[in-house]
């Protein structure tokens, strides 16, 4: 991918920081004022370059529709790939009209350690930019307790966002119900057994005999890990 100039990186970093702090991107005028770019045309030139290079997605109809891409997150140090790299701050409160922010219900807690019961009631709601979840619509959040998934960047106090589904591919991070208690692990299907594997090397996996495994054990697949603003 084509590299960025120092000024383009500065613009991209400002857009990302405004989304992090406020939950929505800045206007063109706000970018110009913050970075001492005297004309809106000058700001637009930088935005067009960022879009052309694949670091920014824009909606020309909306002044605040400036969405950093996955390449932008990598350029800014956010990484990419598995669940732990998809970490963004959470923003509380209702989504602004016309924004791309969507509200996600937080329905309880889940263990990244010993399994605990996940309470099926809405405790809170948070909002994230829709582009982070792609086409995933049936998504809910669970607060993580325990440290068995720290190898995947899932830390105690984080929220995992979970796509509701009853199946999973080998190696995916799932929320599973085992003996009426919920836990988050990677799942592996191994002949006559199913292995729920932590990513903390100090933790042991949980094994379920294939004959005892039911599709209802899978509550969903983790599609993101989110950290609330402090």
Curated annotation (Swiss-Prot):
Ranges of the DNA-binding region feature: 28-48
EC number(s) reported in the record: 3.4.21.88
Sites annotated Cleavage: 112-113
Catalysed reaction, written as an equation: Hydrolysis of Ala-|-Gly bond in repressor LexA
Keyword field contains Repressor: yes
Active site: 148 (for autocatalytic cleavage activity), 185 (for autocatalytic cleavage activity)
Entry annotated with the keyword Manganese: no
Listed GO MF terms: DNA binding; serine-type endopeptidase activity
HAMAP family given in the database record: LexA (MF_00015)
Functional summary from the UniProt entry: Represses a number of genes involved in the response to DNA damage (SOS response), including recA and lexA. In the presence of single-stranded DNA, RecA interacts with LexA causing an autocatalytic cleavage which disrupts the DNA-binding part of LexA, leading to derepression of the SOS regulon and eventually DNA repair.
Subunit details: Homodimer.
Annotated protein name in UniProt: LexA repressor
Organism (species): Anaeromyxobacter sp. (strain K)
């Amino acid at each position: 991918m084509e590299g960025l100039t120092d000024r383009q990186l500065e613009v991209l970093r400002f857009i990302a920081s405004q989304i992090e702090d406020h939950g929505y991107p800045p206007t063109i005028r706000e970018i110009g004022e913050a970075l001492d770019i005297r004309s809106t045309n000058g700001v637009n030139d930088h935005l067009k370059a960022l879009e052309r290079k694949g670091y920014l997605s824009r909606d020309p109809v909306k002044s605040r529709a400036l969405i950093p891409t996955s390449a932008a997150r990598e350029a800014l140090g956010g990484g990419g790939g598995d669940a732990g790299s998809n970490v963004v701050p959470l923003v509380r409160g209702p989504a602004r009209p016309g924004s791309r922010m969507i509200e996600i219900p937080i329905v309880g807690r889940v263990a990244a350690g010993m399994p605990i019961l996940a309470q099926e009631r809405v405790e809170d709601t948070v909002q994230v930019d829709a582009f982070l979840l792609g086409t995933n619509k049936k998504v809910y959040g669970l607060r993580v307790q325990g440290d068995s998934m720290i190898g995947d960047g899932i830390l105690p106090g984080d929220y995992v966002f979970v796509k509701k589904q009853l199946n999973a591919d080998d190696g995916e991070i799932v929320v599973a119900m085992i003996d009426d208690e919920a836990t988050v692990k990677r799942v592996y299907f191994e002949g006559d057994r199913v292995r729920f594997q932590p990513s903390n090397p100090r933790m042991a996996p949980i094994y379920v005999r294939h004959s005892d495994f039911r599709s209802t054990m899978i509550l969903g697949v983790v599609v993101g890990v989110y950290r609330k603003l402090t």
